[in-house]
């Protein structure tokens, strides 16, 4: 016991074999899902959540809709969180569905982490903007803003300008395609005075501004790398 196995060879030489004590295990390789699969699944899940919320709202007699953004009211600040999840009716939600799917999917192509941060910035900043200016132009008193269209306008604005900030060909192409297909809806962010109810241009405008802010903030790594590259080129010494 405790002896090392040995095998004699000619000439008296001894070969010692030492057990490693570590059993060999087969190597496992995790397969990373393509970005478009992750993005598509994420957006489909989010839109499915919106339909579930609307179903609950309809079954409750539209009681959830009172949780929208009520401008300049302290309790209306809760709407900043809940408003993008609420819709006035099925028609309202279905009108937002295709833009949510298309623009949301394109947003995820920049990376899921960047998509989450951009959405959070647009969601909160756009909601706060709506809370501040939501009553501007209303001819029938205080308003209550609900719907995911502010998020749509934020994603749209983000996609339009993000490529310009990062100076990457693929992102610029996406921005141009989005401009060609959805550029016309930006008219929905134009102020309309003397309006009673209807489309929330205040939410659209606030969402679009928040989208530009998000694109600028989240393009910081690329902009910083570009600035360092320019600085390095200027400070380079000529070769002798």
Curated annotation (Swiss-Prot):
InterPro entries: Peptidase_S54_rhomboid_dom, Rhomboid-like_sf. GO terms for molecular function: serine-type endopeptidase activity. Residues 1-11 have a biased composition (Basic residues). It is a multi-pass membrane protein. Gene3D superfamilies: Rhomboid-like (1.20.1540.10). Keywords: Cell membrane, Membrane, Transmembrane, Transmembrane helix. GO terms for cellular component: plasma membrane. It is found in: Cell membrane. The chain crosses the membrane at residues 36-56, 93-113, 115-135, 146-166, 172-192, 198-218. Residues 1-32 are annotated as: Disordered. Residues 17-31 have a biased composition (Low complexity). To M.leprae ML1171. This is Uncharacterized protein Mb1372. The lineage of its organism: Bacteria, Bacillati, Actinomycetota, Actinomycetes, Mycobacteriales.
